[in-house]
Amino acid sequence: MKLVVGLGNPGEEYARTRHNVGFVVADRLAQLAGASFSAKKFAAELAEARLGPERVWIMKPQTYMNHSGEAVGAALRFWKLGLDDLVVVHDDLELDPYRVQLKVGGGHGGHNGVKSVNAHVGSPEYARVRVGVGRPPPRMDPADYVLGKFAKGEDAELDLCVEQAVEATRLAVELGAARAMNQVNRRSRAAD
């Protein structure tokens, strides 16, 4: 069994914001798997699905970004899952917009949701699907930038990026992060 976590903030006011791209990917992954977020546990919305041979819980923590790790840590402990069973999808300021990268471990890059997950699972050594949102314009607070909404004209690029992130997540679940990284990151570099 695997746990896939899309990071974001609950509430309609955060829909379509850069910071909620993890929720968008989780929603699309569940939709493609024919699953719905019908369960509520660990202060999160959960959808049970199958990705290839793997049973997967897709999670959207409802604790707000800075406390996302509470739900993730509780779920890992409850289901007795290890860090190699965890895939977290989140926005990333350090990646160019619409670029998708898969990595294991590394720093949190100032992302409070990732910081919280690291603190509650005891390590950064889990798979992360990083979805690039780019850097804010000069003199703009990064918090204001990530809480800003994607522009209407960005729909096609965002949709393609979400599909790439869904595929990266699926590969991480089905192949394991190490094998999946070769495919996902090679594709991402080829798109440059």
Swiss-Prot record:
Keywords: Cytoplasm, Hydrolase, RNA-binding, tRNA-binding
Residues binding tRNA, per UniProt: 14, 64, 66, 112
Localization (cell): Cytoplasm
Record GO biological process: protein quality control for misfolded or incompletely synthesized proteins; rescue of stalled ribosome
Active site, renumbered: 19 (proton acceptor)
Keyword tRNA-binding: yes
EC numbers: 3.1.1.29
Enzyme's top EC category: hydrolase
PROSITE patterns noted in UniProt: PEPT_TRNA_HYDROL_1 (PS01195), PEPT_TRNA_HYDROL_2 (PS01196)
Catalytic activity: an N-acyl-L-alpha-aminoacyl-tRNA + H2O = an N-acyl-L-amino acid + a tRNA + H(+)
CDD domains: PTH (cd00462)
Keyword Transmembrane in annotation: no
One of the Pfam families matching this protein, by short name: Pept_tRNA_hydro
One Gene Ontology cellular component: cytoplasm
UniProt-annotated site: Stabilizes the basic form of H active site to accept a proton, residues: 91
GO MF annotation terms: peptidyl-tRNA hydrolase activity; tRNA binding
Highest taxon of source: Bacteria
Site (Discriminates between blocked and unblocked aminoacyl-tRNA): 9
Quaternary state and interactors: Monomer.
Function as written in the Swiss-Prot or TrEMBL entry: Hydrolyzes ribosome-free peptidyl-tRNAs (with 1 or more amino acids incorporated), which drop off the ribosome during protein synthesis, or as a result of ribosome stalling.
Family according to the record: Belongs to the PTH family.
Name under which the protein is recorded: Peptidyl-tRNA hydrolase
Source species of the chain: Anaeromyxobacter dehalogenans (strain 2CP-1 / ATCC BAA-258)
